[in-house]
Amino acid sequence: SLETLLGGLDSGRALAFASGMAAAAVVFQRLPVGSQLAIPTDPYHGVAGIVAEGERQGRWSVRRLDQADTASWVAAVAECDLVWLESPENPLITVADLPTICGVPRADATIVAVDSTFATPLNQQPLALGADVVMHSATKFIGGHSDLLAGVLTVSRDDLHDEFHERRLLHGASIGAMEAFLTIRGARTLGLRLERAQANAMELATRLEGHREVSRVRYPGLASHPTHEVAARFMSGFGAMLSFETTGPGERATEVCERTELINHATSLGGVESTMERRATIPGQERIPPTLIRFSVGCEDVEDLWADLDQALDATSARRRGAG
């Protein structure tokens, strides 16, 4: 079954949900009033919304931590009821020091959860590092074909499995039969797809880093990435997600996204097709650098992808110079 397959990938007991958000919500819903929780400064916007709503209602207090500030996360594990990590983080692609953070001794009631969507089970194993819960939006890389909604929680403890199973029933968050079938189909080719996509990502990140119209590239596989050494210590691969910042004003980044022909200008990610978008235009993402483009690298020919990126960057540069 789907849950047996997904549990095997993450080395735990898995529960499938109707979406990634449905899976994440179950974890936050278990917190009693007065809880303390820690989340990244810039988490997935749906998680940010859940946390902000509970904060407004007075349900919990929140620490928003820099993903790279390992000392603050270590302190949070000792003091909070829920520690929610997202690694690599969306959209800055920052990798948390999971071996250190997840290995901190903690109270039995404290839960350390990791959104591992960008890494997939093939690139990191949070449960083996000491996490209690791993969450994936299976809509993304596990499904891999941009044609389903699904989520998964994999846990290391039987009591959490039973609790989340009950909450899934109470909240009507069970996955549909067709979505379960499609997720199984996608998971069977995850290894092949990820191998190609992350090889493409490494090549494109390297080339973008040297492009005259790009001011910064964020990809854990690059030695220039702030958390490259952290990622290299425990990840099996660096994934297929990267982000880069164009030169010029923020609007120029939007134009680059609109100019591509092979790469889709879209918000979803993790499919066989490449997608990208300017994240600062998304509500709640105003703190993101204005020219940052999040790029989900697919399985197309890498030379075709590079030609598309290069022409979009050059075309918008020519217009900018002409306007000046």
Where are these regions (language model features)?
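A common structural junction motif
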Residues: 171-172, 259-270, 312-321
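Conserved PLP-enzyme active-site core in the AAT-like
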Residues: 14-213
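Short amphipathic alpha-helices in soluble, non-transmembrane regions
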Residues: 164, 254-261, 308-313
